[in-house]
């Protein structure tokens, strides 16, 4: 039998994982991406003349990658060395109010006690136990399934797991659910922020998203060379198995060709293939951007159902006044006002700001010279309406800087050379999204079941990435790529 050919359109996390699994199993794999390097959203830019991650910065669920690499005979730790963070994140509010979450659960409980009192510490202990129960119930029955299915979830969770899900009021919102554990508004704010990991509002997202707390407690890792290095490793390993990568190669059309497909690039070159894994936002297919034949292959995401976008700045500066670690969150005073603005399609007046200090780990001592920094604030996914006016972008940068200053962080070198990326730029990078970075918003308990599965309505055409099941985030996108590869292998070998 001739070697089966599979084309992967997109070299983001989902596409890279699919390419690794397929090439490791002996399939003829070609990967196409219009960018000059692998990574997709795990892209890299420069700050102070040095490379810096400009996309996802938090690496969790390392065992997913260990298992995937092991399935094709590789040792993930040898391929991508990483250090486990002892401080998961440092959180700050106005003045000197600061709180660290630790990898060690006992230390975190004691930190909550010192920060907010014994009642909140007891609530945090219950919250941690319940978030672990939710993850255990959903990991196999939902996250690792090829498509979202409510009955399958119930069956997979079993009689033992179902009470664990019901115990956290899965039909209520995350914000309301957090009220069962915390009276301190700052802690509700902190754990409510987990909804933004999937581009959603804690006031609309389901309470089951508390599972993110357990995922982080299970381990936050710092990969040597940054997150972009992870993308490079996946591409390198797939290439070693024989996969061929085509960069600066924009797939303009996917067309039927007998029982298979033809991919046509923007330069006119064509490639024949037996199956296609599309590692772009599912909305691009639904909107017919790769050919009108595929408009019904997967449901479209209406603009009002989009997840969040962001405005990010990457720059280099010396800092003082606040002891940065790798991951830092500076909370605004009014969390509800933030998400009300986003829901109305507006930039936030007083934004919560995330700062990744890529040159730091758990050591918060000042760095010699300028250090690489990424700052991020949430923004509405309105990038298809045009770029933000320069004065609005500058005003948002000023407001973000004021938030950092209110928490004590000062830049000795004003980041005038900061590279900003706003929703219209994300929309250009990831077409059909409006700049949404996480696919469909996870608002309401049904939302997770409305994401498309990895199999589309077209035989031989599959989805992989954060807009497909099981959802956004680096490990979830990896799981979708693994599932897409598994489905493609099963379907092709059964023909």
What are these regions (language model features)?
Residues 252-367:
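Mid-domain catalytic core of redox enzymes
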Residues 4-137:
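N-terminal glycine-rich phosphate/pyrophosphate-binding loop and immediately adjacent elements
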Residues 94-204:
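Rossmann-like flavin
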Residues 466-488:
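A conserved FAD-binding loop/helix module that cradles the flavin
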Residues 184-198, 350-354, 410-470:
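A glycine-rich dinucleotide-binding beta-alpha-beta segment and adjacent secondary-structure elements
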Residues 490-495:
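Active-site-proximal substrate-binding core of FAD-dependent oxidoreductases
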Residues 318-428:
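C-terminal segments that line or cap access tunnels to active or ligand-binding sites in enzymes
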Residues 211-257:
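Helical element adjacent to the flavin cofactor pocket in flavoenzyme catalytic cores
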């Amino acid at each position: 039998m001739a070697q089966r050919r599979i084309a992967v359109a997109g070299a983001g996390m989902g596409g890279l994982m699919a390419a690794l699994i397929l090439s490791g199993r002996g399939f003829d794999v070609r990967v196409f991406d219009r960018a000059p390097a692998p990574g997709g959203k795990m892209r890299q830019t420069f700050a102070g003349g040095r490379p810096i991650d400009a996309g996802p910065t938090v690496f969790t669920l390392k065992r997913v990658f260990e298992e995937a690499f092991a399935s094709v005979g590789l040792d993930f730790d040898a391929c991508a060395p990483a250090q486990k963070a002892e401080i998961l994140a440092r959180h700050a509010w106005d003045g000197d109010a600061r709180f660290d979450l630790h990898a060690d659960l006992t230390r975190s409980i004691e930190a909550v006690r010192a920060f907010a009192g014994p009642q909140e510490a007891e609530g945090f202990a219950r919250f941690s136990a319940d978030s672990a129960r939710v993850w255990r119930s959903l990991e196999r029955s939902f996250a690792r399934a090829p498509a979202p299915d409510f009955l399958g979830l119930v069956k997979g969770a079993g009689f033992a797991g179902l009470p664990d899900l019901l115990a956290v009021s899965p039909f209520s919102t995350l914000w309301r659910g957090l009220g069962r554990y915390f009276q301190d508004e700052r802690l509700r704010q902190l754990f409510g922020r987990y909804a933004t990991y999937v581009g959603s509002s804690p006031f609309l997202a389901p309470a089951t998203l508390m599972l993110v707390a357990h995922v982080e407690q299970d381990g936050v890792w710092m990969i040597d060379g940054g997150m972009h290095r992870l993308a490079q490793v996946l591409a390198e390993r797939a290439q070693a198995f024989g996969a061929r990568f085509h960069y600066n190669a924009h797939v303009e059309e996917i067309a039927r060709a007998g029982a298979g497909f033809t991919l046509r690039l923007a330069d006119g070159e064509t490639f024949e293939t037996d199956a296609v894994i599309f590692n772009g936002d599912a909305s691009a297919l639904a909107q017919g951007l790769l050919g009108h034949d595929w408009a019904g292959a997967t449901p479209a995401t209406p603009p009002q159902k989009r997840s969040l976008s962001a405005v990010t700045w990457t720059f280099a500066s010396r800092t003082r006044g606040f002891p940065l670690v790798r991951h830092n969150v500076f909370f605004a005073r009014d969390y509800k006002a933030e998400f009300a603005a986003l829901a109305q399609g507006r930039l936030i007046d007083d934004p919560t700001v995330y700062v990744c200090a890529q040159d730091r780990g758990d050591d918060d001592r000042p760095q010699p010279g300028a250090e690489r920094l990424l700052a991020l604030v949430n923004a509405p996914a309105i990038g298809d309406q045009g770029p933000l006016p320069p004065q609005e972008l500058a005003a948002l940068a000023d407001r973000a800087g004021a938030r950092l200053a209110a928490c004590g962080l000062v830049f000795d070198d004003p980041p005038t050379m900061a590279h900003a990326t706003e929703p219209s730029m994300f929309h250009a990078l990831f077409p059909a999204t409006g700049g949404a970075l996480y696919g469909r918003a996870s608002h309401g308990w049904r939302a997770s079941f409305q994401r498309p599965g990895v199999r589309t309505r077209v035989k031989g055409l599959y989805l992989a990435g954060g807009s497909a099941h099981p959802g956004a985030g680096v490990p979830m996108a990896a799981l979708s790529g693994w599932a897409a590869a598994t489905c493609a292998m099963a379907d092709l070998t059964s023909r």
